[in-house]
Amino acid sequence: MSKQPIITSEEVRGVIRNLLDSTLSAAREANEFEVGRVVDAADGVAHIEGLPALMASELVEFSNGTFGVTLNLDEDLAGVVVLGEFDGIVEGMDVRSTGRVLSIPVGDAFLGRVVDPLGRPVDGLGEVPHETYRELELQAAGVMQRRSVHEPIQTGIKAIDTMIPIGRGQRQLIIGDRQTGKTTIAIDTIINQKDNWSDPEKRVFCIYVAIGQKGSTIAGVKRVLEEAGCMEYTTIVATPASDPAGFKYIAPYSGSAIGQHWMYQGRHVLIVFDDLSKQAEAYRAISLLLRRPPGREAYPGDVFYLHSRLLERCAKLSDEMGGGSMTGLPIIETKANDISAYIPTNVISITDGQIFLQSDLFNANQRPAVDVGISVSRVGGDAQIKSIKKVSGMLKLELAQYRALEAFSMFASDLDAVSRRQLDRGARLSELLRQQQQSPYPVEDQVVSIWVGSNGYIDDIPLSDVLDFERDLLEYLRNRTSILDDLRTCGDLTDALLERLKEAVESFKNKVYFMRVDEREKDPLEDENIGQEELVRSRRAN
């Protein structure tokens, strides 16, 4: 009986081949990154050498665990912006390439959370589960992947929805001096999306990117959104003023990456950049430290590209791409109402319109302090709801004429009856557009309010009583008629609905409002209120 060999030669060769493959694979894994060293480091920027294969925007890791992103690629050196604490970065420190372009985790779990520009939680609620990673420097959607803006996104603010409408996928700039209500408009717009959250077709995912804001301001925004019940559909990307310039530079791109993830899933996104002036200043500081040649106002030559490649990501996608959208509300802070400065003119030329907030109007208690003369929406009119478009057609012109006539009347000794009526109508329309913050108006309420003002139903109402008249009228229509419900359902102010509205307004005004006024005037007054009542009566007589 012959003995069979235990192992054949082919089996031996196979074992050796597998061993060599595993050894080479382990060697490749052990050497998958290169190691360089820091040549110099100062003010949040480090120059490194020994990494010739670095890519633009590649993430590098210093030996102390701090990350940085490559912005400059020279022949021998690479300029890296440190993303995190800079104190531990010293000359001679090892730094390794990661082979990854700067990216952040994204997913639905980010709703209701506060994260930093790297997607790390800063709200103390633990890690954020993520679905995937998304690069920060991805190309925006191409021309053939888009469609025109045709769906409205309601802010709940009468002055904006009627005269400066915004559509889904639009980029609408909010610009004005500090402390004029820019952030308030953005936050009110987020709050107004609450009613749509229960409808999967209408729901809007909101992102608030705080760039260089005070920590107390960011905490205040979060508190307002929590109290309004809006954090469940909102993500806050927080970059306080104490953060390094690198974080302020990448924060808007991080927010847009989170939003693009939802947009390409066919969802609708609203993103607020508060504000891009501080991002431009951070980028200027980084560029000067990287020894890039300065240009106008010491900004680098590519500062326009900084904002254009960011805001171009806001779009309304075609049906073939899922039909999602990302609406951008960038905020720019001006100095002394100068919108002709470098950064404001750049962003105005990139966006699809601007809402200009005037400090004089704000100080005169006209809030929101929208200057309708130079505020414009270039594409939002195509998305405006029919009923609002019908009632607000001449509103912007009337208010612009009122502002001009008001300025003229300061120097005129006497005005004719037509001019005086125009002044009275304009004053009441301006009063009608005043609105408290965090109190958005539904579309149907806006339609009734503007229609009543434009058709002279408040011309004989004392100026101080205009908002009370509006509140009581809307309450009357809500409780006694179905007009508001029909307006909301129909979306158009039909002839039949218009006749019903006329009858209801006249009935309220004659049978309810004036009866209440008469009863109020019959009530006995306290001694200290008699003088005030005489003043009110004299105003009505005039």
Curated annotation (Swiss-Prot):
Organism: Tropheryma whipplei (strain Twist) (Whipple's bacillus)
InterPro entries, A to Z: ATP_synth_asu-like_sf, ATP_synth_asu_C, ATP_synth_asu_C_sf, ATP_synth_F1_a_nt-bd_dom, ATP_synth_F1_asu, ATPase_a/bsu_AS, ATPase_F1/V1/A1_a/bsu_N, ATPase_F1/V1/A1_a/bsu_N_sf
Binding site residues for ATP: G176, D177, R178, Q179, T180, G181, K182, T183
A GO molecular-function annotation: ADP binding
Site entry (Required for activity), positions: S375
Taxonomy, superkingdom: Bacteria
Keyword Cell membrane part of the UniProt annotation: yes
Listed EC numbers: 7.1.2.2
Catalytic activity: ATP + H2O + 4 H(+)(in) = ADP + phosphate + 5 H(+)(out)
A Gene Ontology term for the protein's cellular component: proton-transporting ATP synthase complex
Biological role: Produces ATP from ADP in the presence of a proton gradient across the membrane. The alpha chain is a regulatory subunit.
The name this protein goes by in its record: ATP synthase subunit alpha
